[in-house]
Amino acid sequence: MALAAAPGFSAAAPSLPDLDRNAVRRIGQAWRDSHPEATERTLSARLFPAGRGPEALPALRAAVAADFRAGRIFIHRGWRLSDTEGALFALLAMET
């Protein structure tokens, strides 16, 4: 699960030093190619409706699990990600 790479979201993406920004851009752009209507504002509202506080990660994990149960899958170069994970990569790519 892509969320395992991000232990918390209390700060913006640039403070995640271990993030492979090139990979984030590639995955985020691939997701955005199939969701051209997505904007930084809409993705932020979708992924972080209560802000990026301590409750954000459990909420994202629940959304990821719900995506997999519902078959909302995003496939990029053989990787099977939830739609929520794809959206998160897109948002991180926009913020970096």
Give the location of each predicted region.
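Extracytoplasmic/lumenal soluble domains of exported proteins with redox or metal-associated functions
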Residues: 11-96
